[in-house]
């Protein structure tokens, strides 16, 4: 079933500009991020446009089209800590030496990891320091 979903995203949604531009904002940082890093399969210009339309700070966008790739390969050395809502992405970054925190969502509720529940700078700093102390 997952491979069918992946094929449909690649074949259909990757070309649907309106789909990508109308995604709802689920989290908003209370700080200016160093960069954005995504594995979206859409045109990178659409991601930049979505960020602009939704009032996000203008920062570099690093986009990886290979879904099994490691985001750390693109951004290691550019950020102090990486936050993602994908367990796989967080684990790959951590194994590569890039500190990473898991964003708490319905999909990640059962994973007992170092998490953040918002993109609040103070919460991220606390979670990062806790992770560095105990990981």
Question: What are the residue ranges of the model-derived segments?
Answer:
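Short, well-ordered alpha-helix to beta-strand connector turns
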Residues: 31-32, 58-59, 78-79, 97, ...
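A structural preference for short, hydrophobic beta-strand core positions in alpha/beta folds
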Residues: 35, 60-63, 102
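Short, acidic loop-to-helix structural element flanking the phosphoryl-transfer center
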Residues: 2-36, 40-50
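Short acidic-hydrophobic, aromatic-tinged amphipathic segments that line or gate anion-handling sites
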Residues: 61-66, 115-127
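Short amphipathic alpha-helix with an adjacent loop that forms part of the alpha/beta core around
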Residues: 72-76, 120-135
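Substrate-recognition "cap/lid" segment bordering the active-site pocket of phosphatases
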Residues: 40-81, 87-94
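Acidic, Mg2+-coordinating phosphoryl-transfer loop and its flanking beta/alpha structural elements
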Residues: 82-119
């Amino acid at each position: 079933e997952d491979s069918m979903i992946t094929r449909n995203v690649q074949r259909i949604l990757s070309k649907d500009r309106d789909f990508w531009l109308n995604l709802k904002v689920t989290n908003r940082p209370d700080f200016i991020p160093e960069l954005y890093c995504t594995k979206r399969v859409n045109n990178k210009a659409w991601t930049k446009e979505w960020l602009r339309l939704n009032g996000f700070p203008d920062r570099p966008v690093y986009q990886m089209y290979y879904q099994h790739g490691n985001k750390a390969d693109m951004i290691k050395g550019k950020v102090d800590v990486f936050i993602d809502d994908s367990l796989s992405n967080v684990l790959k970054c951590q194994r590569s030496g890039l500190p990473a925190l898991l964003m708490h969502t319905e999909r990640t509720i059962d994973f007992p990891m170092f998490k953040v529940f918002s993109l609040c700078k103070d919460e991220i700093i606390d979670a990062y320091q806790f992770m560095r102390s105990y990981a």
